[in-house]
């Protein structure tokens, strides 16, 4: 496959969706064939699962149920949208991928990262981004951004405690340390233009390098902590 697979991660309110939109425009202006998608969602079945997972009324949802639903949505999304785009040689910008499950369900929910990885390993069948940009921000700042943004949907995860969101951030940081080759950390608390400039530089450096859509090394689940 000749496409590029890039994912973008971050706690709630980190601004990743805004960055992806700006990056899409930047790359299109330079002639790249770009596809933007999101998780959970991206295709009909996955969007239906998204509505179920993020529904604020389902506060009783079990952590394992949540993890399994995310993995199911991811599988369908991958097969219907991501793989065909990669086969067509497109640049895929994905708003969240498997690292979200590892950080949210594995770390913050306390299910265990190895356990959550095993579920997702079955779902993704070896497909991993060649680059993951993690937008790091203090959860208090991120949640305040959400409260101030009236256009953004407030979902079930937004209503979690600050302690939960602190654990999500801790999980992401551990993943970034474990997979330093793939995950690039960007300080998202800085001005928008500064964050965007670093994001562009990071993505362009990979576009000018290898065209592999996933790293075989990322399939090694022998050490997650």
UniProtKB/Swiss-Prot annotation:
Superkingdom of origin: Bacteria
GO cellular component: cytosol
Signal sequence region: none
UniProt-listed GO biological process terms: dTDP biosynthetic process; dTTP biosynthetic process; dUDP biosynthetic process
UniProt keywords, alphabetically: ATP-binding, Kinase, Nucleotide biosynthesis, Nucleotide-binding, Transferase
One Pfam family here: Thymidylate_kin
GO molecular function: ATP binding; dTMP kinase activity
Amino acids binding ATP: 10-17
Catalytic reaction list: dTMP + ATP = dTDP + ADP
E.C. number(s) listed in UniProt: 2.7.4.9
Entry similarity comment: Belongs to the thymidylate kinase family.
Role this protein plays: Phosphorylation of dTMP to form dTDP in both de novo and salvage pathways of dTTP synthesis.
PANTHER family: THYMIDYLATE KINASE (PTHR10344), UMP-CMP KINASE 2, MITOCHONDRIAL (PTHR10344:SF4)
UniProt-listed NCBIfam families: DTMP_kinase (TIGR00041)
Protein name, per record: Thymidylate kinase
Organism: Geobacillus thermodenitrificans (strain NG80-2)
Designated gene of the protein: tmk
